[in-house]
Structure formats: structure tokens, C-alpha cells
């Protein structure tokens, strides 16, 4: 793109300007401290969606991603968030882990991840899915079978020798649209929208 811009320039001044900009994008790295995106080369990140409306034509089913567990994240969503708001080797916490989509993306992008899941059988599914993803960045993925509405997150982080997490991502049940279990502590079993919001608020307060 930059080369084409240079070739289409009609004055020496503009050619010089675009060459200087291209050189800067190649040789200098400028970040904002929040993520690893090189702001001098931001045009090259064509896979990062910059529009306010995200149109995803197809969910990512590559690697260990699959849609077998109902209501799970479309992988592109945590991928976009992690790349925008975290850096490599930082910690990400998902209090509604489900089948493990967030932690799979953590492994792909070089982020450490902690996932909390209420149902023991879903924990085993998540462990399987996450283990199938190659750990090319040698990051940690920790899975805890617990109730996020009651869990003392500070104590759990201390047990894992983690001082803090840099990003919290939540994909809770949409109240009663999908019933995930018979567990009364499951947010999808809340008796009313008010009860659901109270339980969700407890998770947010705990984290």
C-alpha cells in the first residue's frame, strides 16, 4: 500500500514524505503501552477490525476451536479484544470459561490465561480443547472448577503465584436463553432478570 502511494505521488515533496513514513514504519516501533500494536505501522494490521460494527462472515474453526458446546464465544471476539487491550505474557481472566475459547486464544497470542468454570464436566471439555492447541509461546493456562459468584479471586491468584491480571473478559449466559445446567448457582437458572443481574454483579465485584 505504501509503495503504491509513493508511485502515485505527483511531487518530489510528497514522494519524500511517503518514503520517510515508510522507513519509519519499518525501522521504528511505537506502542501505546496497552498492547503490542506498532502505531507506526498500524495500516498493516488489516485483520484488526477498526469499525464499530464487527461483521464476521464465519466463525473461526481452526486448530482446537469448535462449536460443539452451545453458547460459546465466537473466537474472533476474544482475539480482537486480547490484541487490542493486552500485551504478550500478560494475564487474562475469564470467569465464564465454558469450553475454553478465551484460553485457546491466549495460547495463540502469547497471553497467560485463567479460566473459571462452574460445571466439572465442562471443565474437562475445556482442558481437552485447550490442550490440543499448540503452546508456541510457552504461556500458562490455569483452569479452576468453581463458582465465580462466590470465589475469592485474590486468594486463587495468590495460590497460583500470580500478583495481578491485566484483562478481564466475560461472556456470561444470556439469562435463560440457554439452560446450561441444573445447578442453582448457574446464572442461566436465575429466577428473574433481577436475580440474574445480582449474580452477575457478584462476579464483577469478586473480580
Please name every model-derived segment:
Residues 1-207:
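Class I S-adenosyl-L-methionine-dependent methyltransferase catalytic core
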Amino acid at each position: 500500500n505504501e509503495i503504491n502511494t509513493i508511485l502515485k505521488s505527483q511531487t518530489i515533496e510528497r514522494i519524500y514524505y511517503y518514503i520517510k513514513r515508510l522507513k519509519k514504519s519499518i525501522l521504528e516501533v511505537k506502542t501505546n503501552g496497552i498492547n503490542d500494536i506498532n502505531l507506526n505501522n498500524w495500516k498493516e494490521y488489516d485483520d484488526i477490525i477498526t469499525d464499530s460494527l464487527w461483521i464476521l462472515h464465519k466463525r473461526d474453526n481452526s486448530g482446537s476451536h469448535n462449536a460443539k458446546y452451545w453458547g460459546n464465544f465466537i473466537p474472533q471476539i476474544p482475539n480482537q479484544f486480547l490484541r487490542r487491550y493486552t500485551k504478550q505474557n500478560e494475564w487474562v481472566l475469564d470467569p465464564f470459561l465454558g469450553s475454553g475459547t478465551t484460553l485457546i486464544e491466549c495460547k495463540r497470542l502469547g497471553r497467560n490465561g485463567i479460566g473459571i468454570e462452574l460445571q466439572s464436566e465442562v471443565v474437562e471439555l475445556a482442558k481437552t480443547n485447550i490442550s490440543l492447541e499448540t503452546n508456541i509461546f510457552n504461556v500458562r493456562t490455569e483452569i479452576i472448577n468453581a463458582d465465580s459468584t462466590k470465589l475469592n479471586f485474590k486468594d486463587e491468584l495468590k495460590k497460583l503465584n500470580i500478583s495481578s491480571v491485566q484483562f478481564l473478559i466475560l461472556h456470561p449466559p444470556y439469562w435463560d436463553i440457554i439452560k446450561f445446567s441444573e445447578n442453582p448457582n448457574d446464572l442461566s437458572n436465575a429466577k428473574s432478570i433481577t436475580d440474574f443481574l445480582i449474580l452477575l454483579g457478584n462476579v464483577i465485584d469478586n473480580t
